[in-house]
Amino acid sequence: MEKRKIILDCEPGHDDAIAMMMAAKHPAIDLLGITIVAGNQTLDKTLINGLNVCQKLEINVPVYAGMPQPIMRKQIVADNIHGETGLDGPVFEPLTRQAESTHAVKYIIDTLMASDGDITLVPVGPLSNIAVAMRMQPAILPKIREIVLMGGAYGTGNFTPSAEFNIFADPEAARVVFTSGVPLVMMGLDLTNQTVCTPDVIARMERVGGPAGELFSDIMNFTLKTQFEYYGLAGGPVHDATCIGYLINPDGIKTQDMYVEVDVNSGPCYGRTVCDELGVLGKPANTKVGITIDTDWFWGLVEECVRGYIKTH
């Protein structure tokens, strides 16, 4: 089996933590590094959350802090969903794990430039780190094998009627990425909302147990409350984890090639991913857009990763 080399760019974040857990354990993924961006909460908080998850699950991968602000817009956070810490719910041991001193953007540039073009970027938060890296060193563009991102929607948004949070948090950065010419795969809300983590899924992971089962339970029981409160959902979708699922086995997720453009005009559609589903613009497709996911397969994959953290000795 070919291991996909990835850099996971995230803003933990409840579903980010599930993506980290899966990426670090599945044998099909070679997780080179974790870069952190501001998003669900401010950078100081998302960094601590990322380090806490790595410490609890003994994920021995370097962690790099990145952009603390969006490129242009005023910063927003998703504390309504993720709480004051950005990862409310779990209680962690005192933190001893530390981030690397190198800036995430420099790490992304240096790693890509030294590569053979075989590294996939997996940004599951606002695209600030990726866009700044692209602007600082355009020579990375042909070095990126693929970008598999969580963000956007071809239907309704979740932070405004038009926009999904990750894109709305930094639309200008998203515009840079979507016009980069790099092969893109977009897991938008239309797909990720199919992965609602209901109480029976939580119970299934609790039965598996181990440190990842415990963390999964603490994380997803918190989002049960907030997702029902704000969106009327029967549980929290594990949005970001769908990107890892796609990388492990793209056959589990149906995609459609579309031309996607990010609206950066101020107004009610600011931050919208405009997806030309019918091809009416006649522009060449630049994105594989996730349409449907085999949820039985997906939860089986999550369980497999949770089970991987149980120590046998």
Swiss-Prot record:
Recorded GO molecular functions are: calcium ion binding; purine nucleosidase activity; ribosylpyrimidine nucleosidase activity
Which keywords accompany this UniProt record? Calcium, Glycosidase, Hydrolase, Metal-binding
Q: Which GO terms describe its biological process?
A: purine nucleoside catabolic process; pyrimidine nucleobase metabolic process; pyrimidine ribonucleoside catabolic process
* Cofactors named for this entry: Ca(2+)
Active site location: 11 (proton acceptor)
User: Which CDD domains does this entry report, sorted A to Z?
Assistant: nuc_hydro_IU_UC_XIUA (cd02651)
Give me the disulphide-bonded residues.
Answer: none
Function in brief? Hydrolyzes cytidine or uridine to ribose and cytosine or uracil, respectively. Has a clear preference for cytidine over uridine. Strictly specific for ribonucleosides.
Record text on cofactor binding: Binds 1 Ca(2+) ion per monomer.
Binding site residues for Ca(2+): 11, 16, 124, 240
EC nos: 3.2.2.8
Cite the record's note on assembly: Homotetramer.
Which InterPro entries does the protein's record reference?
Answer: Inosine/uridine_hydrolase_dom (IPR001910), IUNH (IPR023186), Pyrim_hydro_RihB (IPR022977), Ribo_hydro-like (IPR036452)
Spell out the family assignment given in the record's similarity comment: Belongs to the IUNH family. RihB subfamily.
Record-given protein name: Pyrimidine-specific ribonucleoside hydrolase RihB
